């Protein structure tokens, strides 16, 4: 029976997930597969590479940098998260991501993204973090404050738009015994999205905000 780890997103709340994953690493816990959504994917990749403390460390160091995540970024680049700092400067040199350890890991890693043209979730397997960094970026590209990410002919946004807790999807992939880390309180029910706002912002992609697509 394959074991899986399912990581909900939640922007800044995701730092809770990072702490739980650090404890898992301290205890030597291993999973056959990890699937993350948005912030869950961002922190989950450091779990797969075995870099305990990395997520919390770089978050604490750069959280107040305007190039990390800020309204300044949004005004000047059209995206609230700084692409260059977060997806290149930090993992490549400032707080290096262990790409080699990720490549050698026997844990399968998936990032959940939303395909704005189909209105459905895409569960994309990442085998080479350096060359597939745009998948990770797409998974965490929050709606309204991020640009669409083009990847292999798909236009992608934050995975939370279509499947914020991809437990059933992971089960269908063969991961039958799962641990799920949530970033909302027990009993939380996600409110329906504002269809009018979504229509104004994503009028070219009606399947992203229609109820039929969301229910599938």
Language-model segments: which ranges?
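Patatin-like phospholipase
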Residues: 1-37, 45-211
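A short, hydrophobic C-terminal helix/tail in secreted or cell-surface proteins
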Residues: 212-216
